[in-house]
A protein has these predicted regions:
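Bacterial Sec-dependent N-terminal signal peptides
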Residues: 1-8, 12-42
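Acidic/polar, low-complexity intrinsically disordered N-terminal segments immediately downstream
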Residues: 25-186, 195-210
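Beta-propeller blade signature
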Residues: 57-59, 104-107, 153-169, 221-271, ...
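Secondary-structure boundary elements
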Residues: 167-170, 198-206, 214, 264-277, ...
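Surface-exposed loop and turn segments in beta-propeller and other repeat-based domains
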Residues: 174-191, 270-292, 319
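Short, solvent-exposed beta-strand-terminating loops
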Residues: 207-229
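Extracellular structured ligand-interaction cores
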Residues: 258-263, 292-294, 302
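Long, well-ordered mid-to-C-terminal structural blocks that present hydrophobic/aromatic surfaces
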Residues: 301-319
């Protein structure tokens, strides 16, 4: 019974983001008073005297009342994304401005109290994440090893993966010396891609392959063969931009194919063997907030896979 309560609570919490303020025992909230500890976990931030503290609270309900931090809650460092692994653990993934971020996990004890597990990891920069088998996997696209530089010194883009083994509390990464992790020309059109979402279905991984345009490496490949006629003026002539919209001289920023949607189906967690599916009925499938690419590919109870797109093709131009 406790296991089911915990499962329901975690998934309910995953759908909402709450910022709460501490209250005293005699304060009333939403006409229902202060609720007790329970199977629901709430990632909250409490502000007092100009200082903000991150707290993992538990509650017996999400339907009303006030959740208090008095004798309730575990202070933590906060997280960019909270990921729930089945009915067992809660992971706090931290994105640290393009560098490795600290990640740790938590569990709920028999007294409805959240406790931290011992493992702590500095995972690679990530732009998407998901669960497959015994792993929480994070992914981003970044520069490959110097051994693969072209004659101009440009590095190819590669998939950068992190694997958190939930039960073993271990952390590993992929070997980018393996050319199977090359994201350049991933779709056969010369552009590099990043992945949006990691969905486990029938023991395979489904992920949207989001085309990102031509990197310096891709733009120079075979004398610029991947630059479509008429798009020569889109190639950057100098470095510019900032943060997740920055670019370098020689890049063709953003895709030349906004009217295409690609889904990659990987055989297992290594992401080294794949099948590609394409449609021109929708644009590429992801949600976007700064450097994060959010999953918009989901499975239904009957086993069907649904892919959603914000219709980027309608909003993109050559400007």
């Amino acid at each position: 019974m406790k296991k089911n309560f915990f499962l329901n609570g975690l998934f309910a919490t995953a759908m909402v983001g709450l910022t709460l303020t501490a209250c005293s025992d005699d304060e009333q909230g939403n006409g229902a008073g202060t609720v007790g500890k329970g199977e629901y976990v709430i990632a909250a931030s409490v502000t007092a005297s100009g200082n903000t503290t991150n707290v993992l609270l538990t509650s017996e309900t999400l339907n009303g009342g006030t959740v208090s931090t008095i004798n309730n809650g575990l202070v933590n460092d906060g997280a960019t994304q909270w990921v729930f692994y089945k009915d067992q653990y809660l992971y706090g993934l931290t994105y640290n401005q393009g560098n490795a971020g600290t990640t740790r996990s938590y569990f709920m004890n028999a007294n409805y109290e959240v406790q931290a597990r011992s493992g702590e990891y500095a995972v690679k920069r990530f732009t998407t994440y998901g669960i497959y088998d015994k792993y929480i996997i994070t992914s981003s696209t970044g520069d490959g090893p110097t051994e693969y530089a072209d004659e101009n010194g440009y590095l190819p883009k590669m998939f950068l993966l992190s694997y958190l083994d939930v039960a073993a509390e271990t952390y590993t990464t992929n070997n980018t010396q393996n050319k199977a992790y090359m994201s350049e020309n991933f779709l056969g059109n010369g552009e590099f891609v990043t992945l949006a979402g990691i969905l486990e279905h029938n023991n395979k991984i489904y992920s949207a392959a989001v085309p990102m345009g031509l990197s310096q490496y891709g733009g120079k490949a075979n004398g610029g063969q991947w630059i479509l006629p008429g798009n020569e003026d889109l190639v950057k002539t100098e470095d510019g931009g900032s943060n997740s919209s920055s670019y370098k001289k020689g890049e063709l920023q953003w895709t030349q194919y906004p009217n295409e949607c690609w889904v990659a189906i990987f055989d297992d967690e290594t992401l080294t063997t794949k099948k590609l599916i394409k449609t021109e009925q929708i644009s590429y499938a992801c949600g976007r907030m700064k450097s994060q690419y959010y999953q918009t590919i989901w499975s239904a109870d009957n086993g069907d896979i649904y892919v959603f797109s914000p219709s980027y093709a309608k909003t993109m131009s050559d400007a």
